[in-house]
């Protein structure tokens, strides 16, 4: 019957997540429980090169479950951590968010056996109301951030946060210089006022590496294969240009900074 065909269709199955841990030190006001962090490691991966960290908003899980995206991340040796419910739209370290994150990564390292998770490079990703946190994560974790993805999202240090409240103040010395960042806006959600803070940011921080993608033909909630492929290509280039075999004194992989003065800059059209 049609019902049985739908039931057994492999296209309807959610993606596999091999491990999970409960986050200590935080109780969600959505569930009145501790959130859960789910970990996906690519098949046959002996050592993880990087982890994409997304909090539960709308499109993060859809991207993580996309078969094309998983296939490309498997080739790169990049895994996923998905936190549900989310813990912080701002990434405010004064609230203990950083400590919760580091404990989560240590717990996932222990339960999975991938000890490198404690210090592996991170790609923060967030959609809509969670689209501001990736930039702030990078500002407070510059040495560990491989790249930043703001999906149908926000500009760094924007005054128009997706969650509708004030943004965090970085201070005079904190920056994301040399870290490739990608701000994605759908064609049918485009608002110039959301882009302007990113243009101003690039002028204020000339060593920053902010890229833009107008997601043609897409709206706020779309996660198309073409978009997933573009993000994968962006991360492939970040891996090839930034990862080194060197390790810092605190055990982190040393990342090469990207120089925006080298390469090509495309004008808007």
Named regions from a protein language model:
Residues 44-92, 157-158, 191-193:
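Short substrate-entry loop that stabilizes the transition state in hydrolases
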Residues 12-51, 96, 122-145, 149, ...:
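A domain-start/cap signature at the N-terminus of enzymes
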Residues 91-117, 136:
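Alpha/beta-hydrolase active-site loop
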Residues 146-232:
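The feature captures the conserved acid-bearing segment of alpha/beta-hydrolase catalytic domains
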């Amino acid at each position: 019957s049609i019902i049985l065909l739908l039931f057994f269709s492999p296209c309807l199955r959610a993606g596999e997540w091999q491990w999970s841990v409960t986050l200590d030190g935080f109780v969600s006001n959505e569930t009145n429980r501790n959130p859960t962090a789910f970990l996906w490691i690519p098949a046959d991966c002996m050592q993880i090169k990087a982890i994409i960290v997304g909090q539960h908003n709308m499109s993060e899980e859809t991207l993580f479950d996309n078969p094309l995206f998983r296939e490309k991340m498997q080739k790169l040796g990049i895994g996923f951590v998905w936190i549900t419910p989310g813990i912080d739209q701002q990434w405010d370290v004064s609230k203990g968010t950083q400590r919760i994150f580091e404990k989560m990564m240590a717990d996932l390292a222990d339960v999975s056996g991938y000890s490198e998770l404690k210090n592996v490079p991170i790609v923060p990703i967030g959609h809509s109301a969670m689209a501001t946190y990736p930039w702030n994560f990078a500002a407070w974790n510059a040495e560990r951030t491989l790249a930043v993805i703001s999906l149908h999202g926000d500009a760094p240090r924007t005054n128009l946060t997706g969650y509708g409240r004030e943004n965090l103040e970085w201070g005079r010395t904190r920056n994301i210089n040399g870290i490739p960042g990608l701000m994605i806006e759908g064609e049918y959600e485009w608002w110039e006022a959301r882009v302007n803070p990113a243009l101003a940011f690039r002028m204020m921080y000339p060593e920053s590496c902010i890229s833009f993608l107008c997601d043609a033909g897409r709206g706020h909630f779309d996660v198309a294969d073409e978009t997933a492929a573009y993000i994968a290509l962006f991360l492939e280039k970040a891996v090839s240009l930034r990862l080194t075999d060197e390790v810092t004194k605190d055990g982190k992989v040393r990342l090469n900074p990207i120089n925006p003065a080298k390469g090509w800059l495309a004008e808007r059209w």
